[in-house]
From Swiss-Prot:
Active-site feature positions: E322 (proton donor), H351, K455
Molecular functions per Gene Ontology: carbohydrate derivative binding; glucose-6-phosphate isomerase activity; monosaccharide binding
Keyword tags: Cytoplasm, Gluconeogenesis, Glycolysis, Isomerase
Enzyme class: isomerase
PANTHER family, sorted: GLUCOSE-6-PHOSPHATE ISOMERASE
Name the record gives this protein: Glucose-6-phosphate isomerase
Function: Catalyzes the reversible isomerization of glucose-6-phosphate to fructose-6-phosphate.
Keyword Ion transport applies: no
């Protein structure tokens, strides 16, 4: 295309909403009008399915559940008065709790105010709160936040060391719908141990965000934790940021959660439009479908040109990949769907992997996220008439142009600033785009059987470990092959070897002797 033709295409496909000052540019995606026309029937089906979902239909057929994250920012959409009241009551309880913490009405037993938050959760129970806290945390935050988002002992130690004596003034939020997520349970037990070692009572500083009636809920009631907030079975982890999962920590940090919900609600209204060209989420889904031929054949690279949006790509990685990465479609046919997502931030990435994006394998499309406001207040001049923010903007435009010149497609999202309203809108935009795309390709975006398969496999490994320890404690040194035979686990010999190696490295009673280059020569014995 000539420069004039490209400009005209930009004008033809530019989406702008004045209420949010939000721009979406898909002009650098290579689809034509014929493709758009061919997709219209699919989109009409997707719009109808989305309307049914919002009305309370069973949109997650595998688990026979409603999907209600859109209700969280507009309770009147919920299909029953009871649900509407429940959503409003939870929000009011979060706001009241945060106010009492900030005012000192709720305080740790030491009598001082809470200084820190330790949020324990994994997956959607961590990625959303981490993204929002990084994007929106005030410079003079009312509390500092830390996360246990794994089951890494060294990671636990690092966070606890950072807290130090402030553990006595730390509010611990444990987030788990079932209360049985192993990583979250482990983090809770680790921090309870740290409290006990310091002679601090845990319950007066503990808050549960969990399903009503769950194991964790019962623990919190029995031990008289400071507070409990609900997680609903109609809200999935990856779409839970605007529930108690994300709103509680955000409110405690002093983030305007009312504005965040309002931004999401505004974007929801825009993305209900049944005209494809007037629906920004549909335009995203259209572009994704075009890029990967409806089969996820190209990766999505997220490039936010703003430090505060650093974690947005990680948040989207789960939202998109866990939702769309499915083996089977709704009819049970094997389809192997999904879109791989990665990214960091601009312009840092221009000094990392953008070289490959421009000149390497063309197996991706990029999404640039542009923020118009550089900072609050004036900027110093770094060159005559040029600021650091001008450089950042120029680098974004230059990278976009350089990719297009080499046949690499891209989308550009532009927001006026990074604030609570805009972050809420971005979350809602991608939630809707994922739902629409899932309908286009005929999959269930709201379950995650692959995650459950990994959990079951891990449980099997731990059961083998228990059997190994019991066998070795009988006192007879054994080869790895002999252990496998004795346990009737010959097909798990590699797993047995790796368990033994891990136990020895952590001085857990196992000693291995023999040639490390040849694991079959190793003899395992129990050291009392």
């Amino acid at each position: 295309m000539t420069a004039q033709q490209l400009w005209q295409r930009y004008l033809d496909w530019l989406y702008y909403d004045p209420s949010l000052e939000f721009y979406l540019d898909i002009s650098r995606m290579g689809f034509d009008d014929a493709f758009v026309t061919s997709m219209q029937p699919k989109f009409q089906h997707a719009f109808a399915a989305m309307a049914e979902l919002e009305a309370g239909a069973i949109a997650n057929p595998d688990e026979q559940r409603m999907v209600g994250h859109y209700w969280l920012r507009d309770p009147e959409l919920a299909p029953t008065p009871e649900l509407q009241t429940q959503i409003r009551d939870t929000l009011a309880a979060i706001q009241d709790f945060a106010l009492k913490v900030h005012s000192g009405v709720l305080r740790p037993p030491t009598g001082s105010r809470f200084t820190d938050i330790l949020s324990i959760g994994i997956g959607g129970s961590a990625l959303g709160p981490q993204f929002v806290s990084e994007a929106l945390r005030p410079q003079a935050a009312l509390l500092q936040i830390h996360f246990f988002d794994n089951t890494d002992p060294a990671g636990f130690d690092r966070v606890l060391a950072d807290l130090g004596d402030r553990l006595a003034s730390t509010l611990v939020i444990v987030i788990s719908k079932s209360g049985g997520t192993p990583e979250t349970r482990n983090g809770m037990l680790e921090v309870q141990s740290a409290f006990a070692q310091r002679g601090i009572a845990f319950a007066p500083q503990a808050v549960a965000v969990t399903g009503v009636g769950s194991h964790l809920d019962h623990v919190a009631i029995t031990e008289r934790w400071l507070a409990r907030f609900p997680m609903e079975d109609w809200v999935g982890g990856r779409t839970s940021e605007l529930s108690a999962v994300g709103l509680l920590s955000a409110a405690l940090l002093g983030i305007d959660i009312t504005a965040m919900l309002a931004g999401a609600r505004q974007m929801d209204a825009l993305t209900r439009h049944s005209d494809l060209r007037q629906n920004p989420a549909a335009l995203l889904a259209l572009s994704w479908y075009w890029a990967g031929n409806g089969q996820g054949k190209k990766d999505m690279v997220i490039l936010p040109y703003k430090d505060s949006l650093l974690l947005f790509s990680r948040y989207l990685q789960q939202l998109i990949m866990e939702s769309l990465g499915k083996e089977r479609d709704l009819l049970g046919k094997v389809v192997h769907q999904g879109i791989a997502v990665y990214g960091n931030k601009g312009s840092t990435d221009q000094h990392a992997y953008v070289q490959q994006l421009r000149e390497g394998i063309p197996n991706f499309f990029a999404t640039f996220i542009e923020v118009l406001e550089d900072r609050q207040g004036p900027s110093p001049v770094v060159e005559p008439g040029i600021t650091s923010g001008d450089y950042l903007s120029g680098l974004l435009q230059g990278t976009r142009a350089a990719l297009y010149e080499n046949g690499r497609e891209s989308i550009t999202i532009t927001v006026p600033r990074v604030d609570a309203q805009q972050v809420g809108a971005l979350i809602a935009l991608y939630e809707r785009a994922v739902g629409l795309y899932a309908s286009l390709v005929g999959i269930n975006a709201y379950h995650q059987p692959g995650v459950e398969a990994g959990k079951k496999a891990a449980a099997g490994v731990l059961e083998i470990q228990r059997q190994i320890v019991e066998l070795l404690q009988q006192g007879q040194p054994l080869s790895i092959a002999a252990i496998a035979d004795d346990l009737g686990q010959s097909e798990q010999i590699e797993t047995i070897y790796k368990i033994l190696r891990h136990l020895e490295a952590n001085q857990r009673g196992v000693q291995l002797t023999g040639d490390r280059h040849n694991p079959l020569s190793l003899i395992a014995s129990w050291q009392r």
